[in-house]
């Protein structure tokens, strides 16, 4: 088993050019035509630019600057190969569903004891933020998931649309980063699929965790510690 850290970045997804041009993304522009993907009318989300850099480029630069990753796997289309630095950065072909892309990425790094999972749409990510998250994750934890308090998120990103979980401890927003033990999650691939299918509904996610968790969530009695304990039971 490898001892260093692997990184998995899921970079799938497309957006219609018309939808992108009508959006209100600040200072955003389409990626170069050479990397537009399936014709001029469809753009690869990971290659959309904020300022002068593609979203994927921002994430990869931050990962590289940490000096922590022995291997980085990017799950996406062939057009992304241009942005990678082999041999330590490799491309895994994307699949049709986001959770299948996560599973494919974990399969590629299953010999590592820990893998950092990131999405490619993190325009404000920095090497320091990644390092602090990695350092905060207990080395023996099978899953660490990034969350932030609503007041901190709103102060940093005012007017940004997001979904908040209202818990007894406060309101929280989910991050786009996880530290995982690949083998442990791969053994529960079906559970990952169910979580992914319900990811847009906090109620359905709570139901997946059991009626007791759902009741506590509905009555605003659920705490972060309760979620952690239930996750330990499920994993």
List PLM regions with ranges.
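Conserved core of the sugar-phosphate nucleotidyltransferase
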Residues: 125-233
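Structural motif
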Residues: 8-10, 116, 145, 179
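Conserved N-terminal catalytic core of the sugar/cofactor nucleotidyltransferase
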Residues: 1-9, 13-17, 53-114, 127, ...
């Amino acid at each position: 088993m490898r001892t260093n850290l692997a990184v998995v970045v899921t970079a799938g997804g497309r957006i219609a050019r018309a939808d992108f041009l009508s959006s209100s993304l600040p200072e955003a522009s389409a990626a170069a035509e050479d990397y537009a993907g399936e014709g001029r009318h469809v753009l690869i989300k990971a290659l959309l630019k904020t300022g002068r850099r593609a979203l994927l480029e921002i994430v990869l630069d931050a990962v590289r600057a940490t000096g922590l990753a022995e291997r980085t796997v990017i799950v996406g289309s062939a057009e992304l190969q241009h942005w990678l630095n082999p041999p330590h950065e490799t491309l895994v072909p994307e699949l049709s569903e986001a959770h299948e892309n996560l599973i494919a990425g974990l399969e590629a790094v299953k010999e590592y004891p820990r893998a950092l999972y990131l999405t490619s749409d993190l325009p404000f990510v920095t090497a320091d933020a990644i390092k602090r998250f990695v350092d905060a994750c207990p080395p023996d934890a099978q899953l660490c998931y990034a969350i932030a308090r609503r007041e901190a998120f709103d102060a940093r990103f005012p007017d940004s649309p997001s979904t908040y979980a209202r818990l007894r401890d406060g309101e929280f927003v989910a991050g786009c980063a996880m530290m995982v033990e690949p083998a442990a999650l791969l053994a529960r691939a079906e559970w990952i699929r169910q979580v992914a299918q319900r990811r847009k509904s906090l109620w359905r996610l709570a139901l997946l965790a059991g009626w007791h968790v759902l009741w506590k969530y509905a009555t605003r009695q659920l705490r972060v510690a309760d979620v952690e304990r239930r996750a330990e039971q499920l994993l």
